[in-house]
C-alpha cells in the first residue's frame, strides 16, 4: 500500500516493516512508553487523549497516553506505523497476517481487545511530513478509476463482452475481503472459445482447466468478477480476462462496499511505469 509505505518512512522504518492496518473503524491504543507514530491513509479522525492529531506526519505519543481512531470519513483503511516497528516474526518472507490460514503477524490473527503489542526502539524525529503532491488522492464521490491490463484470458470474451466490462460501473459487494473483491454489474458475453470448448474445461463459459492466477487477476466466476488481491488463491478453474496492476492496489484498499469501480485499460508498459513512479515517491524524497 502507498499509505502504508509512507507511514513507515515517516517514523524512520524500512517501507516493508510491520504496521497496523485498520479497516472501516480504528482501535484505541494505550502506550506504555514514549513512541513516534505516523497515521496515513483514510481519515479515521485520530485523537490523542481527546485532542485531534494530523495524518501524514510523525507525531509523539507519550507513556500513558491513548491514541483513538474512529470511523473512516474518507477511504476505508488507515495505517499506523510505529518507530522501531511492531515486533513480529517473518512468515515466508512477510510480516503480514493471513487470517484465514491463521499464520503470520502476531499469533496469526487480528489484534484482540486487551492484547499487548511489542514495539522496537528507535530515535525517530517528530514533525516530519509527507509532501502534499505525493499524498494519494482518495475518491470522495464513491467512484474509483481502476487501471487494468488485458489478459491472460481476454480472448474468451467477445467484442461486446470485452467492451461492456470496460464501459460499466461495477459495484463493490460487502462480501469482499483480502482474498477477493466481488463485483456486481452487467452480464458479459463470450466468444466461441468459451461456449464451444471441450468438456474438461467445465460447463460454464467462464470455466477453464485449472490455471495459475496472477495477483490482481479479475477472476470471472460465472458472471461475477472477483479481483484476487493479496490473500487470494494462486490457481483455479475460472478465466481471468483482465488483471489489476500492483500500483493500483491502494485504490482497491480504500474503496468501501457499495462504491463503484470504473476500469481503464492500460498497457503492460504503462503499468510498469506506474509501479516505478510509486516506488520512487515512496522514498525519503517525499518527506519534508
Model-predicted regions and their roles:
Residues 1-288:
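Conserved "landmark" site that anchors the functional core of diverse proteins
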Amino acid at each position: 500500500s502507498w499509505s502504508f509505505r509512507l507511514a513507515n518512512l515517516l517514523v524512520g522504518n524500512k517501507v516493508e516493516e510491520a504496521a497496523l492496518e485498520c479497516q472501516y473503524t480504528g482501535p484505541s491504543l494505550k502506550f506504555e512508553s514514549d513512541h513516534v507514530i505516523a497515521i496515513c491513509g483514510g481519515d479515521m479522525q485520530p485523537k490523542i487523549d481527546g485532542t485531534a492529531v494530523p495524518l501524514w506526519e510523525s507525531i509523539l505519543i507519550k507513556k500513558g497516553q491513548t491514541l483513538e481512531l474512529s470511523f473512516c470519513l474518507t477511504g476505508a483503511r488507515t495505517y499506523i506505523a510505529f518507530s522501531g516497528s511492531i515486533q513480529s516474526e517473518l512468515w515466508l518472507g512477510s510480516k503480514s497476517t493471513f487470517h484465514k490460514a491463521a499464520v503470520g503477524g502476531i499469533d496469526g490473527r487480528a489484534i484482540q481487545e486487551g492484547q499487548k503489542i511489542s514495539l522496537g526502539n528507535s530515535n525517530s524525529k517528530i514533525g516530519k511530513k509527507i509532501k502534499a503532491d505525493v499524498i494519494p488522492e482518495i475518491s470522495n464521490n464513491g467512484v474509483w478509476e481502476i487501471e487494468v491490463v488485458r489478459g491472460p484470458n481476454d480472448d474468451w470474451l467477445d467484442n461486446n463482452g470485452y467492451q461492456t466490462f470496460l464501459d460499466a460501473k461495477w459495484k463493490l459487494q460487502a462480501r469482499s475481503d483480502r482474498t477477493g473483491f466481488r463485483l456486481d454489474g452487467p452480464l458479459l458475453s463470450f466468444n466461441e472459445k468459451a461456449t464451444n470448448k471441450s468438456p474438461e474445461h467445465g460447463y460454464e463459459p467462464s470455466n477453464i482447466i485449472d490455471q495459475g492466477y496472477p495477483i490482481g487477476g479479475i477472476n470471472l466466476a460465472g458472471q461475477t468478477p472477483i479481483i484476487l488481491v493479496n490473500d487470494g488463491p494462486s490457481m483455479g478453474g475460472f478465466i481471468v480476462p483482465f488483471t489489476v496492476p500492483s500500483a493500483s492496489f491502494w485504490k482497491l484498499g480504500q474503496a468501501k462496499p457499495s462504491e463503484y469501480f470504473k476500469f481503464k485499460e492500460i498497457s503492460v508498459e504503462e503499468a510498469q511505469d506506474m509501479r516505478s513512479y510509486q516506488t520512487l515517491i515512496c522514498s525519503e524524497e517525499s518527506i519534508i
